[in-house]
Amino acid sequence: MKLKNILIVVKDIEKSKQFYHDLFGLDMLLDNDGNMILTEGLVLQDEKIWRNFLEKDIVPKSNSCELYFEEKNIEAFIEKLEKLYPSIQYVNRLMTHSWGQKVIRFYDLDGNLIEVGTPIGSQPL
């Protein structure tokens, strides 16, 4: 068995597609009417479709999982984030863990938690 994709629920697929392209360079591989697959295996699912499948409420900012990305030049990434999405809501501004990794956490447009960190292997021990 193999993990194929990670799916997140979004209110506006086009805005979310642009967000993930702008910040992470993800491109669309398949658009299947409310179910969009991006490069790196991220799937955007229209909230209305997901709600019909589950018959449950969607809880933004539930903080129960996160999408994790690595970026060598995290300061340049933060500049880009703040330029393109100045009203982004941070969970943690830039911080450095005890093992030397720099990270930030913020919510995407729909309250999905994202962490961006410097590559772990590049930290001096």
For each predicted feature, which ranges?
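Short glycine-enriched loop/turn motifs at secondary-structure junctions
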Residues: 1-3, 59-64, 97-98
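Short beta->alpha transition motifs characteristic of CBS
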Residues: 8, 46, 98, 105, ...
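Amphipathic alpha-helical segments
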Residues: 12-26
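Vicinal oxygen chelate
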Residues: 13, 67-113
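A generic "structured core" feature
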Residues: 17, 36-37, 45, 88-91
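Conserved short beta-strand elements that form part of the metal-binding/catalytic scaffold
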Residues: 27-61, 113-118
